[in-house]
């Protein structure tokens, strides 16, 4: 079945037809869970940092107040169509690589996306869309992004070494946890005809790619994963890749031990800064252009005139966001 036919029958699977499917990716992997120390009547507990994920480390770098809202206060946020697309696409791509190489076709990926959405819609996003037409438009747009993926690489040409790899790694006094999308070995041939094998970490993104001048910042999480691989396997990955399906755009960065040593030091500094904020209760809000994408700008953030203890009602419009 081609893309056009697949789009036309977007709803051919009823949710009840795929109840046996289970979502293998831990749903709250990036929500660090600090322990509350000194909990007793009349005492405000002090959080203790126990684990840190790349996402939450990035949150603290961006804005300490954002980290507090997500990891300490655990303020719930409304799911968005962008999050749903990213979650569903990741699951579909994971299942694509579970198939024999000749079966990794666009048509199979479209079907896997429909299957994944039918199950995730019931379990995680039951009220995301207000109409059938809105859901159909979202589905067809999602299939267009998946079609773009096949213009970036041929999934039948290699076998991933790892898929959705759950990593929990102790580094000195820190525990770093996250999920690595994919890792594979590829053979690269240079202009002189010489070949070498590379260990590559790949991450999918369904949001728009940042401009090239900001691309290096987007590699923050992947450099953490490269560090975790070095610690657990004793080998330094050669390259990290970001595949932005909405474009499509591919960014790559070659990795070396010097970069990973610097990332180790950066994690040490972030861990210490988070522990200090937990002890002092000081979580400064750092305003920037990214505030326009923040779930808490219009409801909780003191930098925008709100009292976190008495949040304003959340706007009814869909929160702006980037697909994962």
Language model features: what each stretch is:
Residues 3-83, 319-324:
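C-terminal, charged and often intrinsically disordered regions of DNA end-processing helicases
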Residues 11, 24, 92-163:
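A non-catalytic, helix-rich entry segment at domain boundaries
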Residues 27, 31, 51, 194, ...:
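Metal-dependent nuclease catalytic regions and adjoining charged, substrate-binding loops involved
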Residues 57-58, 62-101, 139-143, 160-164:
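Nuclease catalytic cores
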Residues 59-67, 88, 105-126, 235-245:
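Short, compositionally biased low-complexity segments
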Residues 66-73, 90-93, 122-123, 200-206, ...:
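Short acidic (Asp/Glu) and glycine-rich catalytic loops that position anionic groups and cofactors
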Residues 81, 85, 138, 218-221, ...:
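Hydrophobic (often cysteine-bearing) scaffold residues that line and stabilize catalytic clefts
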Residues 165-267:
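Mg2+/Mn2+-dependent nuclease catalytic core
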């Amino acid at each position: 079945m081609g893309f056009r036919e697949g789009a036309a029958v977007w709803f051919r699977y009823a949710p009840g037809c795929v109840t046996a499917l289970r979502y293998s990716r831990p749903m709250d992997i990036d929500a660090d869970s600090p322990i509350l120390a000194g909990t007793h009547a009349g005492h405000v507990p002090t959080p203790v940092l126990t684990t840190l994920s790349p996402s939450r480390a990035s949150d603290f770098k961006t804005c300490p107040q954002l980290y507090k809202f997500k990891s300490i206060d655990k303020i719930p946020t409304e799911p968005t169509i962008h999050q749903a697309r990213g979650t569903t696409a990741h699951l579909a791509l994971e299942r694509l690589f579970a198939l024999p190489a000749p079966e990794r076709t666009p048509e199979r990926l479209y079907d896997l996306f429909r299957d994944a959405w039918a199950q995730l819609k019931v379990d995680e996003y039951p009220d995301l869309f207000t109409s059938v037409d809105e859901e159909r438009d979202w589905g067809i747009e999602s299939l267009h992004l998946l079609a773009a993926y096949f213009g970036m690489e041929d999934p039948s040409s290699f076998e991933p070494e790892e898929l959705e790899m759950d990593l929990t790694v102790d580094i000195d006094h820190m525990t770093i946890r996250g999920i690595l999308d994919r890792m594979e070995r590829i053979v690269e041939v240079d202009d002189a005809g010489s070949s070498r094998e590379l260990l590559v970490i790949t991450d999918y993104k369904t949001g728009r790619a940042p401009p090239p001048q900001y691309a290096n910042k987007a590699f923050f999480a992947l450099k953490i994963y490269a560090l975790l691989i070095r610690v657990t396997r004793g080998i330094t990955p050669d390259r990290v890749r970001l595949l932005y399906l909405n474009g499509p755009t591919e960014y790559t960065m070659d990795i070396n031990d010097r970069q990973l040593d610097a990332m180790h030091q950066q994690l040490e500094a972030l861990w210490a800064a988070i522990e200090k904020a937990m002890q002092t209760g000081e979580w400064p809000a750092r305003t920037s252009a990214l505030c326009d994408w923040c779930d808490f700008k219009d409801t909780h953030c003191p930098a925008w005139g709100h009292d976190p203890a008495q949040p304003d009602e959340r706007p009814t419009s869909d929160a702006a966001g980037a697909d994962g």
